[in-house]
Amino acid sequence: MSKQTLILLYGGRSAEREVSVLSAESVMRAVDYNAFEVKTYFITQSGDFIKTQEFIETPGDDEKLMTNDTVEASQAIKPSDIYEEDAVVFPVLHGPMGEDGSIQGFLETLKLPYVGTNVLSSSVAMDKIMTKRILEVAGVPQVAYTVYIEGEDLEAAVAETLEKLTFPVFVKPANMGSSVGISKAENESELRSAIDLALKYDSRILIEQGVVAREIEVGILGNTTVKTTDPGEVVKDVAFYDYQAKYIDNKITMDIPARVPVEVMTQMRAYAAKAFRALGGCGLARCDFFLTEDGAIYLNELNTMPGFTQWSMYPLLWENMGLSYSDLIKELVVLGQEMFDKRESHLI
């Protein structure tokens, strides 16, 4: 039986490129090499595409994907050269220029099927402010928030925040993930500093009400038929689950399934599916919730390309549901091909 080519895109231009490499290395090891051969392409911080490695069998434990320190400039290619007939692309890219619709539009232009959400849902879900506004209309509960857009009246935005919210608040770039650029502010001075930091990453800033809550996550899989997982909980040894805690210090553990009442679990799964559909999602996503001591549920964000390492929440949630990492990848490829065929059929 001939194998299908699975193209892994990794690295990328965003501040989350290191997470992308970790995720891609996990995927390359988990792939069923009876069904796939894998070709990998590294995207540099400057946006160059580098042809890196090919695998026809499971790589050894010491095999690493080539990155900035090991890629060869002579292997740079035109981005369109990744095209291969009957291949499927897995864009294991996080953050801007990865899960914001940019790469998805590029792949659709090349007529390549790909894993994950489409152009519209990727771009909308990447922007925390747009997500908030759409989910408000959909009736999905969220914490109170204000917005600052660079070029608008900063003093007015600070005044609105002081009027509508209470400290602590969290200040977030609208279009970053993995907690990059996010700060907790306990007073007005810290709020202003947090806005300055967030502006280094984005011109659109979200300011959210801080809540004392457990962080619960639900996995989503599907296109027109949407499946969800039992929730898992992020258990932190730090006050704030930032990039350092997530990926460098490993100061978190995961409780899967989360120890929550059945009715809370059911409601979270329903909200996750509702949010996914409201944003036009397809393929996969991870929906992150806050659960307060008094039982209030707030949707925090919907991540269209969640961390995909072997220790990441998303694949572990599906493993708990009986779907192995390897079979999850197969299912995602099938869903990606299904959406490609549907897009092509609509071009009449």
From Swiss-Prot:
Cofactor: Mg(2+); Mn(2+)
Superkingdom of this protein's organism: Bacteria
Residues binding ATP: 162-217
Residues binding Mg(2+) 1, per UniProt: 288, 301
This enzyme's EC code(s): 6.3.2.4
GO cellular component: cytosol
Catalytic activity line of the entry: 2 D-alanine + ATP = D-alanyl-D-alanine + ADP + phosphate + H(+)
Subcellular location(s) per record: Cytoplasm
Disulphide bond pairs: none
Family as reported in the entry's similarity comment: Belongs to the D-alanine--D-alanine ligase family.
Protein name: D-alanine--D-alanine ligase
Phylogenetic lineage: Bacteria, Bacillati, Bacillota, Bacilli, Lactobacillales
